[in-house]
Amino acid sequence: PLVRQAQGTEFALSDLFLGNMTGSFGETSALLIILGGAYIVWKKSANWHFIASSVISFLVLYAALFYSGIQGAIDPVYALFSGSFLFAAVFMVTDPVSASQTTNLGRWIYGTIFGVMTVLIRVYAGWPEGVTFALLFANMFAQLIDHLIKEQKKKSKEKAAAA
């Protein structure tokens, strides 16, 4: 869908939402991805902070670029429902092994890095996607994010105890 949109032809938004198009297995129906995401959050297999921060940062940055007329930026909702971003935000970013796991702030930062990097790669790089690179980039910083936040909390507690 992203390539077709760049060529000037695109799928209807309803087709993207329902999955009435070609694409990689599992990423074509936004409706099913959202339902699957709701299920894994409800079952507490995934933390909603990852998903929310990824999607919010993705939509905010895409909207800023699209409405400011940046070449290569497409409609944010169309961008959300096309490609593998939504699939990755729900099922890959929430991976308990590689993601920032110990603090809610770390989860928000991790998801935001993923969402922002996906947009920047999609708009400014030569690839129509960018999800894999963005996920790897965010994973590089996951442990550092957790470490820095824990250290900051530790220093705050020590300061409060000393006062």
Please report, for each region that a protein language model flagged, where it lies by residue.
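Alpha-helical transmembrane segments
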Residues: 69, 92-103
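Loop-to-transmembrane alpha-helix initiation sites
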Residues: 76-85, 106-108, 125-138
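Membrane-helix boundary elements
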Residues: 33-75
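Long hydrophobic alpha-helical segments that form multi-pass transmembrane helix bundles
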Residues: 1-33
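Hydrophobic alpha-helical segments embedded in the membrane of multi-pass proteins
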Residues: 31-34, 52-60, 79-94, 108-116
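Structural signal for the C-terminal ends of transmembrane alpha-helices
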Residues: 41-45, 93-94, 141, 145
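Cytosolic-side transmembrane-helix boundaries in multi-pass membrane proteins
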Residues: 123-163
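Hydrophobic alpha-helical transmembrane segments in multi-pass integral membrane proteins
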Residues: 65-70, 116-129
